[in-house]
Amino acid sequence: MTEVLPTVPVVLVFAGHDPSGGAGIQADIEAIVSMGCHATTVITALTVQDTAEVKRFVAVDSMLVMEQARAILEDMPVAAIKIGMVGSVENVEVIHSILMDYPQIPVVLDPVIASGSGATELADEEMIDAMMELLFPLTTLLTPNSLELRTFAPDGDNLDACAHELLESGCEYLLVTGTHENTPDVVNVLYNNFRRMDEFRWERLEGSYHGSGCTLASAIAGLFAQGMEPHTAVREAQEYAHEALKQGYRIGMGQRLPNRLFWAQGSESDDDTFKTDE
C-alpha cells in the first residue's frame, strides 16, 4: 500500500452553511486556505440568510455530524480543529465526544450564539450551558466578542472580570474582540492564566462586516495547524483579518464582506502587513 504523505496541514471545521458566502463554512475555508492549509468541513446547520440577516436555520442531525467528522479524522492527519456554529445541544455532545478522542489536536472555538447583527438567536440557554460545560474545557483558544463574553459570564462587572469568570470554564487562552465596544479603536485582548497576556489595537473601520469573527478564528486555527505558538498566531491572524476587512466589498444590501482572498487578487494598496513566517 502506498503511503500518503501530507503536503499541507489539515484543519477540520465544524460550522454552519451560509448561502451568502460571507460567514460560516465558506468564510472558514477561505481563511484557512489563506494560511496555507487544507480545510475539511463538517456542516452542523443549514441557514437561510443573506448579507443583512439570518432568517432561520435547521440543525444537521447529530449522527450525520459525527459521521462527517470521523470520516475525515480516520483518513487525514488533522492538525487543528475550528468550531463555529454548532446548531444543537446534540451536536455539542457529538463534538465533545470527538474532541475527547483527539486531545492532542488544538481547538479554536468561536462561540456563535447570535447572528452578526445580533437580531437572530442561534443558541438558546440550554445550548449555551452545554457549550460551556462540554466544549470550553477542551478548547485551546476561545474567541468571543465582548457581547458574547457578557452572555457567557454575566456576573462580571467589567470585561476583565467576565474574562476571568470564563477562563474558569477551562479554556487555555481567551481572545476577546472589541468590535462592539464604544471605543475609538477596536481593542482585542488576549488572556492566559487569568491575566491579560496582550492587547491589540486596530483602526475602527466604517460600516459593519459579515463573517469577521469566522475569518479571525479560522485564520488562527490555520496558524495553529502550521505549528505556530498561540500568541504569535493570534497576532498574525489579526493582521490578516484586519486587511481582509479593509479590502472588503459590499455586493448585497446588507453588511460588507471581508475580502479574504485579497492576497491572491493583487491590490493597488502598498500595504504589506500580512506576511506569514517561512
Residue positions per predicted region:
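Charged C-terminal helix
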Residues: 8, 59, 231-278
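Short pre-catalytic strand/loop immediately N-terminal to key active-site residues, enriched for Gly-Thr
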Residues: 14-20, 197-210
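Acidic-glycine-rich active-site phosphate/pyrophosphate-binding loop
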Residues: 2-7, 13, 24, 184-199
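Short, small-residue alpha-helix embedded
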Residues: 31, 151, 207-230
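Conserved N-terminal subdomain of the carbohydrate kinase-like
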Residues: 2-13, 30-121, 266-267
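Conserved phosphate/ATP/ADP-binding segment of small-molecule kinases
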Residues: 122-197
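Phosphate-handling active-site elements
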Residues: 36-40, 196-198, 223-237
